[in-house]
């Protein structure tokens, strides 16, 4: 689970500690990752207080601090090898979707789900293999810390939108809480469907 970035759009607050439907977003993501991987997730974070967020989980600091989510992905693949990466501010990512992404790593270096975003994929809910590490380091050396900056240099497979739709609406699945109005929207989504609780 990547708990990176300064959360500047949320006033610097620890977004994963906010509650949606009576549960912290962090706990929602942990449950989905554990369901998909069959093991306890690891938190990638540079925050000194990160160990207190979930005392039952290991916390690994970024290998290259200050590079946001891409630094978190780098840390995950260099520390863990093949891994599922999910941003800690995405309250509605289901475990079965993550399992499908992980299964795709057999034939690719990265597996990203197609989304409705302008870039067409969601790189902060994806599976990454160790071959991504060198490409991420090269992107960071170029000064490019976008989460997709290294995709052109590795074998990327896409989980087609049709498959993503089997798990729900991509606009909800990949919804992230960046601002107070996003939290209000997440609460409304949670009330609207039992599957989002």
Locations of regions flagged by a protein language model:
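Acidic, Mg2+-coordinating catalytic module of metal-dependent nucleases/exonucleases
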Residues: 180-183
């Amino acid at each position: 689970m990547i708990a990176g970035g300064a959360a500047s759009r949320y006033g610097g607050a620890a977004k994963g500690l906010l509650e949606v439907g009576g549960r912290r977003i962090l706990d929602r993501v942990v449950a989905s990752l554990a369901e998909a991987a069959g093991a306890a997730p690891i938190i990638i974070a540079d925050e000194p207080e990160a160990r207190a967020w979930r005392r039952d989980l290991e916390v690994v600091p970024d290998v290259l601090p200050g590079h946001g989510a891409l630094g978190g992905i780098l840390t995950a693949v260099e520390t863990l090898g093949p891994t599922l990466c999910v941003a800690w501010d995405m309250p509605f990512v289901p475990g079965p979707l993550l399992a499908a992404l992980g299964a795709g790593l057999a034939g690719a270096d990265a597996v990203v789900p197609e989304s409705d975003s302008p870039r067409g994929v969601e790189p902060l809910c994806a599976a990454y293999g160790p071959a991504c590490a060198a490409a991420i380091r090269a992107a960071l050396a170029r000064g490019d810390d976008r989460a997709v900056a290294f995709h052109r240099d590795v074998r990327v497979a896409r989980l087609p939108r049709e498959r993503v739709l089997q798990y729900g609406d991509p606009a909800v699945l990949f919804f992230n809480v960046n601002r107070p109005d996003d939290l209000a929207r997440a609460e409304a989504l949670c009330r609207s469907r039992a599957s989002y609780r």
